[in-house]
Amino acid sequence: MFASLWSVESISGKLNPNKNPQISWFYVFFPAVIGYFVILTGYINSKPSTGTIEILHPSFSTLIYPNSKMEIIASGSVWSEGPLWVEDESTSLGYLLYSDTQLNKIFRWDEGKGFFTVGKTLHSEKSGCKIDKGYCETMHEPGPNGLLKMNVALMPITSQKSVDLLVCQHGERAISLIKENGSRILIATHYQGNRFNSPNDLIWSPEGNLYFTDPSYGLMGKDGINVKKEIQFNGVYMIRKDDISESILTGLPTKNVILLDSEMSMPNGLAFSPDFSKLYVSNSDTENGYWKVFNVSPNTGALSNGRIFYDANNLLLLEKEKHGYKENYGNPDGFRVDIYGNIFASGPGGVLVFSPEGDIIGKFHLDKPVSNVAFGGDGRLYFTVSDMIVRVFIKAKPVRIISSHFLKR
């Protein structure tokens, strides 16, 4: 085969394409094919950009790249929420999980490692409400919300590579463990004998305790008839790691749920400061939106000295006036904190970036309301934006809890 393509000089022994017209054709055609393939893959993998980025303080320039653009990587959701980046040790790549509170599903988005983007796939169905429960189909948002990877220190029989999730379930009005094999365990369902409203977001503390919020969004029915509210406030709670472990072992939801705060009207997103001495919580109320900060006891994990970190009511009013009071263009919602204490928060008009002192240093302006944000292991920040997923390259790095912390304390 090769002899028919290549002519060999009898004296030098060198390959000479000029002696064979087939080789001349090969030298022209092959680079053209490669070039076409590169252009084709670039076109197929290209993603539309959206929104604008505004620098309000020089410090924000150190967190983003020049000429950064936000790009839409997935669409087709109804209300996307709960973004969670998962490192896949088997492929040395990561992927994004996110929930849809109205479709009652968890989706997965992969970049992939081949020539073409893998994109969006279904990760878990009926992940917020079981279909055999009659009220699921009557609820406005029966699905899952916040997602959190289960720590293996609390599940000694689980492999480090296993992706077991703690899920805030609106329809079940519970926090549940959904294992990678599809089995489920209810971790917590009640506070003092009363059913939760609709758990919204959740995070780990370094000690392995679980903090979560429980507003009442998930109680809304499609026909205007809401599910009965059993707890007369919307709270911020904690479950200690030993009680989580016991719940997993027994298969029964824990009764040891600790109320940390009951004063916020709609507690939603929450995150710790880099040294874990403070807890930030957003209040996602269109009539009284703000971010609050609490001191965290290093001994008990209890909260104290709650005060307003940033009052969002003026921003909410501006957005209402801008859009003619017709739609909601973002309340204080989910957020993340970087290693320097900057807060990347979904809020009025897009994603606001706060300094640790509470000043807005930058904005990611978007034309649709943003529900939450997540740091990716690929150097990007991911946004759940109404019916789509958006990402942008950033320099900021997330605060991380090392797994060994759970074992030491």
Enumerate the language-model features and the residues they cover.
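N-terminal secretory signal peptides that target proteins for export/translocation
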Residues: M1-P21
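Bacterial N-terminal signal peptides
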Residues: P31-I39
